Amino acid sequence: MKDEAGERDREVSSLNSKLLSLQLDIKNLHDVCKRQRKTLQDNQLCMEEAMNSSHDKKQAQALAFEESEVEFGSSKQCHLRQLQQLKKKLLVLQQELEFHTEELQTSYYSLRQYQSILEKQTSDLVLLHHHCKLKEDEVILYEEEMGNHNENTGEKLHLAQEQLALAGDKIASLERSLNLYRDKYQSSLSNIELLECQVKMLQGELGGIMGQEPENKGDHSKVRIYTSPCMIQEHQETQKRLSEVWQKVSQQDDLIQELRNKLACSNALVLEREKALIKLQADFASCTATHRYPPSSSEECEDIKKILKHLQEQKDSQCLHVEEYQNLVKDLRVELEAVSEQKRNIMKDMMKLELDLHGLREETSAHIERKDKDITILQCRLQELQLEFTETQKLTLKKDKFLQEKDEMLQELEKKLTQVQNSLLKKEKELEKQQCMATELEMTVKEAKQDKSKEAECKALQAEVQKLKNSLEEAKQQERLAAQQAAQCKEEAALAGCHLEDTQRKLQKGLLLDKQKADTIQELQRELQMLQKESSMAEKEQTSNRKRVEELSLELSEALRKLENSDKEKRQLQKTVAEQDMKMNDMLDRIKHQHREQGSIKCKLEEDLQEATKLLEDKREQLKKSKEHEKLMEGELEALRQEFKKKDKTLKENSRKLEEENENLRAELQCCSTQLESSLNKYNTSQQVIQDLNKEIALQKESLMSLQAQLDKALQKEKHYLQTTITKEAYDALSRKSAACQDDLTQALEKLNHVTSETKSLQQSLTQTQEKKAQLEEEIIAYEERMKKLNTELRKLRGFHQESELEVHAFDKKLEEMSCQVLQWQKQHQNDLKMLAAKEEQLREFQEEMAALKENLLEDDKEPCCLPQWSVPKDTCRLYRGNDQIMTNLEQWAKQQKVANEKLGNQLREQVKYIAKLSGEKDHLHSVMVHLQQENKKLKKEIEEKKMKAENTRLCTKALGPSRTESTQREKVCGTLGWKGLPQDMGQRMDLTKYIGMPHCPGSSYC
C-alpha cells in the first residue's frame, strides 16, 4: 500500500511538472500573440499614414496639375509608379495579415486543446488525490488492526502459557498417581507400541513441517539478498549505457560540425569553378565569333591548334578537379552513412535501455506483489495456528474433565473390589465350615453304616448331607458369580488403566503440540517483523530506484531531443549535398558530353567484346561447377540410399526384437496368470480346510454338550446311588473315573485352544493372501494396459515403418526421375557446348571482321578528307547494326543459359530439402525406437520383480502347508480319543462343571 501511495505521489508530482511546463508554453504563446498583435497594429498605423500621405499627395498633385499640367507631366508618371509600388506593398501586407491571422487561429485552436487537456489532467489529479487519501486511510486502519491483532495474540499466548503450566502441574500429579498402576496392568503394551508408532509418524510429519519453514525462511532471505544487488547492478549498467550514449552524441556533434566545414569549403570551390567555367564559355564564344571563317594562313592554324591544346589541358584539369569533387562527395556520403549507422545504433541502444527500464519496473512490481502474497500467506498461517491453539485448549479442558471422571470411576471400582473381596473371604470361611460339617456328617454316615440299627438316623443324616451339598452347590455358584464379577471388575480396571495411559499420552502429545505451535507462532511473528523490515528497506530502495529511473528518463528525453536535432541537421546537410551533387552532375554532363560523343562507339565495341568473352568464360566455369555438383549429388544420393537400406534393416531388426519381447511378456503374463490360478486354488483349499475345522469344532461342541448331558446323568445316578447307599468300592471307582474324565476334558480344552489359535492364524494368512491376490489382480490389469499400449505403439511403429518404406519407394522413384533429368541436362549441356563452340567461331569471325574494319578506318583516317561525308556514316551504321545484332544474340543466349542454370539450382535445392526432411524423419523413428526399448527394459524389470514377489509368496504358502497338516493331524487325534468311558466315570463331577460352565480360554473365539 505504501509503495502504491509513493508511486501515486510520484505520478502526481510528474503531472504537476507537466502542468507547469504546459502553463509556461501557454504564457509563451500569449506573449507571441501579443507581439504579433503589436506588429499588426504597427503595420495598420503605417498603412494609415501611407494612405493619408498618398491622399495629401494626390490633393497637392491635383492642385499642381490644375496650375501646371505641362510642367509636371513627368512628376505625374513618377507618382503613378509610386502608387503602384504602394499597392503592391499593400497586397503584400494584406497577405501577411492573412497569414498571421491563420497562424493566430491555429494557435488559438491549439490553446483550446491545451486548455481541455489541462482540465482533464486537473480532474485526473483531483481523482488521484482522493484515491491516495482513501488508500492512506485504509493503510492506517490496516496498521491499527494489525497492532490490535498482535496485542490480542500476545495476551492469548500469555493465557495459554499459564493454562499450560497448570495443565503440567495436573499432569505431574496424575503421573504420580498412575505410576502405581503401571506395574499392575501390563496387558496395554500392545496399545502403547501402536501409539508410539503413531507418535513417530506425527513427529516425522512435524519434522517435515519444521524443515519446510526454515527452507521458506531461507528462500525469503535469498530473494531479499538477490533482489537488491541485482537492482544495483542493473542501475549501474543503465548509467554506463547512458554515459556511452552521451559520448556517441558528442562524437556525432563533432562529425556534423566537420561535415559543415567541409561543405562550406566545397561550396566555395564550386563557386570558384563555376566562375571559371563562365569565363571559359565567354572566351570560347568570343573565339568562335572571331574565328568563324577558315584560316587563311598556316600560322593562324597553328595558333588555333595551340589554343585548342590549351583548352583541352584546361578541360582535363577541370575533369580532374571534378573527379576530386566527386570523390569528396562520395567520402561525405560515406561519412553520412556512417553517422546514420551510428545514430541507428544509438537509437537501438536507447530502445534497449527503455526496455531494460520497463523490465526493471516490472520486476520491482512483481517483487512487491510476491512479498505482499508472502505476507498474506503468513498472516493466514498465523490465524490458522491461533485457531488450532484454541481448539487444542478446548481439547485439553475436555480431556481434563474426562480424566477426573475416570479417576472417580476408578475409586468407585476399587471400593467395589474391596467389598467383593471381603464377601469372597466371608464365603470362603463359610465354605470351610460347611466342608468341616460335611466331613463330620460323612464320619457319622460311616458310623451309621457300621451300625445297621441306625438306618433311620442315616436317612436323616443323608437328607441333611443332601441339603448341605445343595447349599454347597449354591455357595459354589455364588463363588463363580463373584469370581466372574471380580474378573469383570479387573477387566474394567485394566481398560480404565489403558484409557488413563492413553489420555496421559494424548495430553503429553497435546502439550508438545501446544509448545510447538507456540514456538511456530513466535517464529512467524519474528518472520513478520523481518518481512516488515525488509519491505520497508525494499520501499526505500524502490524510491531511490524510481528517482534514478526518473533521472535516467529525463536524460533519455534530452538525448532523444538532441538526436532529433541531429536528424534535422543531417537532413539539411543531405539536402545541400544532393543539391551540390545535382549541380556537379550537370557540370560533368556539360563537360563530358563531347568526350562521350567521340569515344562512345569504340568503348561500346570493346566492352561488348570483353563482356562476351567474360560470359563465355563464366559459362564454362558454371558448366564445370555444375558437373562437379552433379557428381557430388550422385555420391550423396548413393550414400543416402545405403543409409536408408541400413536403417530399414535396423528397423526390421528392432521390430523383430520388439515382437520377441512382446512374446516373452505374454509368456510371463501367462506364467503370472497360472501362478494366480494356483494361488486361487490354494485359497479355495484353505477355505475348505477352515470349513472342515469349523465342522470339527461344531462336532466337538456337540460332544461337549453330550458330555455335559452324560455328566448330568452321572450326577443323577450318583444321587440315586447315594440314596441306595452304594458301597465304598464303587464310590472309589467312580471317583477314579471322574478324575480320568477330568484329565481328558482338560486335554480336550487345551486342544480346542490350540485349534482356535491355528484357525486365527489361518484367517490372518487368508486375509494376507486375499490382499496379495487383489494386488496381483491390480498388477495384472496394469500389465494388460501396458500390453495394450505397447501393442498400439507397435501398430503405430509398423504404420510409420510402412509410411517410411512408401516414402523410400517414392524417393527412389524421384531419384530415378532426377537421374533421367540429369541425363537430359547432360545432353542439353553437350548441345549447349556445341552451340558455344559454333558461337565462338562466329565471334572469331566477327573479331577478324572488326580488325579488318579497324584497319580500313585507320587507312581512311590517313587518307585526305576529300571523299564525300555521307559515305562514312553509312559504313559505320552498317557496322553498328551488325554489332548490335551480334550483341543481342549473345545477350539472349546468356539469358537462356542463366534461366536454365537457375532452374537446375532450384531443383537441386528442392532435392536437398527433401533429403533433409527424410533425415529428420529417420531421426524421429530412431528416437521412438530407443524410447520403446527403454519401456521394454522397464517392463522386463517390473516382471522380474513380480516374479520374485510371486516366488516369495509361494515360499510363504509352502511354509504354511506343514502347520495346516499338523493342525489336521491334531484334530484327527482329538477325534480318535477314547470318549467312550465318560458315561461310566463317576466322582468329582462338581469340578468338571466348573470347566464346562466357564472354559477360561484366553484368545479363543468360541468361549
Curated annotation (Swiss-Prot):
It is found in: Cell projection, Cilium, Flagellum. One of its GO terms (cellular component) is sperm head-tail coupling apparatus. Keywords: Cell projection, Cilium, Coiled coil, Disease variant, Flagellum. Residues 76-103, 157-203, 322-717, 759-793, 829-863, 922-956 form a coiled coil. The keyword Transport does not apply. Its main location: other. GO terms for biological process: gene expression; protein localization; protein-containing complex assembly; regulation of protein localization; spermatid development; spermatogenesis. InterPro entries: PMF1-bd. Required for normal spermatogenesis. It functions as a scaffold protein that attaches the sperm head-tail connecting piece to the nuclear envelope, thus maintaining sperm head and tail integrity. May also be involved in the general organization of cellular cytoskeleton. It is linked to Spermatogenic failure 31: An autosomal recessive infertility disorder caused by spermatogenesis defects that result in oligozoospermia with a high proportion of acephalic sperm. This is Polyamine-modulated factor 1-binding protein 1.
